[in-house]
Amino acid sequence: MRRSAAPSQVQGKSFKKTRFIPPGRSNADVSKEITKMSPDPKLFQGAEQSQNDPGVCSSNPCPSEGIPREVGDGTRVDPLPPVHSASKEITESKAQEEEASSLLKYFSVVWCKASKKKHKKWEGDAILIVRGRSFTLKDLEGKDIGRGIGYKFKDLENVEEGQTLIIGGKEIEILGTISSDDFNSGKCFQHGSGSPAVPSSQAARKCFSNPFKSVCQSTQAQGKRWNDCRPRHNPCTPNALVMPRPDENHQRMFNRHCSPIVDVVIDPHLVHHLRPHQKDGIIFLYECVMGMRAVGKCGAILADEMGLGKTLQCISLIWTLQCQGPYGGKPVIKKTLIVTPGSLVNNWRKEFQKWLGSERIKIFTVDQDHKVEEFINSTFHSVLIISYEMLLRSLDQIKTIPFGLLICDEGHRLKNSSIKTTTALSSLSCEKTVILTGTPVQNDLQEFFALVDFVNPGILGSLSSYRKIYEEPIIISREPSSSKEERELGERRATELTRLTGRFILRRTQEVINKYLPPKIENVVFCRPGALQIELYRKLLRSQSVRFCLQGLLENSAHLICIGALKKLCNHPCLLFSSVKGKEFSSSCEENEERNLCQGLLSVFPAGYNPLQFSEEESGKLQVLVKLLAVIHELRPTEKVILVSNYRQTLNVLEEVCKRHGYACARLDGQTPVSQRQHIVDSFNSKYSTDFIFLLSSKAGGVGLNLIGGSHLILYDIDWNPATDIQAMSRVWRDGQKHPVHIYRLLTTGTIEEKIYQRQISKQGLSGAVVDLTRSSEHIQFSVEELKNLFTLHESSHCVTHDLLDCECTGEKGHTEDASEGPVASRQCQFGPQKSDALRPLSMSQLKQWKHFSGDHLNLPDPFLERIRENVSFFFQNITNQAPAV
């Protein structure tokens, strides 16, 4: 007996899988009647005669149903029941199935666990995907939470708003339809998509009106005060840079005292030095930190490439916000915190002094002699500049300071939300946040999410939803084996991610300032390995540790040890010798693994080998470097060289080479005191400097430094992270450079360095998919399969990277002969315009458009390359701002 007055089934009619009913009538009596009837030959004979007899009337060729008829000898026969054509029914059902399979609809729904309760308690929003005869239910994080299959096409076609369904143990109610564009772009997964509405409490808020009006106090005082609210600078003067005025929604949220709107004008002293792209950047930053671009969010990422003046744009923003405001002219902030790498603390102080002098604004830099407590007790310092390391030490004191603006220079180091630095900065109660970085996407899209979530928490949802909705479709679409549907979905998701983040991320490339800079000649130089290097490389690849790594029998640390040993060998065998000798009598587990890797290597070295008295001929890259330094010193005696490495031990070798050849050099690495670094840089940039070479550690000083005193930069080794190398190479080609810039990247041919370089290109393509999406060109993408082969020595190739390009140019000796032998079977690992119609990602170097030269090429156009060709197997060259003579 039913106890509830509720209907036994929800009005929406939950779908149930019905019993199968064959086509046609299913009346039992009719079927028996048909079975009992025996076929009469006369019946068919009469039918044939009626068809062939021209005298028979054709107006009614078939007898009517239910009317008795005579056949042959006049016998009356009962009417035949209507029999449906089986072939027609099957054809119609197949057509319906095909139509159902092509059916694809999307709905926004609410869901809860299936129950018989009359009043449902919905647990959350979801997306219903109707595909063919199946349902898929996804939550707003992109996870599948329910599936159903086997529904009728008629039921699927009639799904409408307000209907309730049961799917996978969950009851849902249809709220509305979603367009395919919104689903493919991912907009439907966004919480509160569209322009955020102003809360009713804020929209209804009015200015406080005191009901009692004093007869002694005149209202003229307040009116006079408001009349005195004038812009700090005249907005009507020529070339005045005026910030946008807040709209009505912004005024409801932030102008609680109904103050008059005042124009915010950038100081004309700064505007005089600003370039057009810098003016646009200041307006962008102002709108972001004031909450005008993303309602309720006051963060921004200035992702301009190196050399575009991010520091000057931030200084202009700070000075403006500390002096002006749109509501009654009241300053927006009082104090600013700038967090930067240790080597750039004094550089920021110099930039403030350069653009604003020492009287307009007071800057406090934290170092060993100046503590945070002094800033707390100071009444006239308004900007605190501190390194990331000192921030962690002084976090408790900094938390007590009410900063209105936080600026994180070289903010790509915040790519991991779980590290101490990111956690410490997130604990500060500072609503307005700006990240400065030239490389917003370094390795993967999760690092990009960490940066975005730091400046504007929650704007992309949770990390799990971000992975499902954006990261996975984008990465899958960039694989060479992806389907057309996957590529289209990934492209739409990347476009939507760019649109979302474009509200608070500004990215400009160096193309905007090319006209202000001298020519830049970039060269990727592939150096032939020395005989000792080849012999040691073979020995390492045959070692037990490498074989176990390839079989997956060792832990991850063993992989890193093998890679580290190969990288040391590529720089110089003496570095590997010192490492092997140092681990010979070690006892720790990690050092035992390295000792096992290097067993038998000492026997390959010459007897009595001394790493301190190394030979330049033992390393292919070192031979090229020595010749390159000699030709630069000969042809450009007044120009200087920056020599960059990732490792201090390698810098020691390079410093010894400089001493042998009598080159005066300066050095900046991790052991250089922070207080002395800016002085070393200034001395090298001075025209009175006698140093020919600047030895630079990319880890300690590869970011933010301005080394325009040198015009030749040589990157001796390569890093897994492309941002490290890009930052280091950007130290010389920037504002203030007077000479043509020459950049050389040295790689050992056929070794692990080429594989690392190829992975760098792949990672840069990922950055282009999101941040630089507006660029369009035919670019190459290396397959994952080609990049897995790290532990291989390609001795017969002049350049493995050029081989992967599938380029038919004559740069490589014998390449055209190989290409003319016949068509080669297409594989997923091959590249070129003819291989795939997919939208290829943007690469760092656009190698297809670069010039390709073999080391055996006759008459190289570059005089520097011509002199070092003896030890080089291949060149890639690209010239920016090409001039008649470089």
From Swiss-Prot:
Positions that bind ATP: 304-311
Superkingdom, natural source: Eukaryota
Compositionally biased region (Polar residues): 1-12, 47-62
A GO CC term attached to the entry: nucleus
PROSITE patterns for this protein: HELICASE_ATP_BIND_1, HELICASE_CTER
Gene Ontology biological process terms from the UniProt entry: determination of adult lifespan; DNA damage response; double-strand break repair via homologous recombination; response to ionizing radiation; response to xenobiotic stimulus
Subcellular locations according to the entry: Nucleus
Region Disordered: start-end pairs: 1-95
Residue intervals of the Helicase C-terminal domain: 627-788
EC number: 3.6.4.-
Family matches, as CDD domains: DEXHc_RAD54B, SF2_C_SNF
Assigned keywords, A-Z: ATP-binding, DNA damage, DNA repair, DNA-binding, Helicase, Hydrolase, Nucleotide-binding, Nucleus, Phosphoprotein
Quaternary organization: Interacts with RAD51 through the NH2-terminal domain.
Family statement: Belongs to the SNF2/RAD54 helicase family.
Protein name (record): DNA repair and recombination protein RAD54B
Natural source organism: Mus musculus (Mouse)
Top-level taxonomy: Eukaryota, Metazoa, Chordata, Craniata, Vertebrata
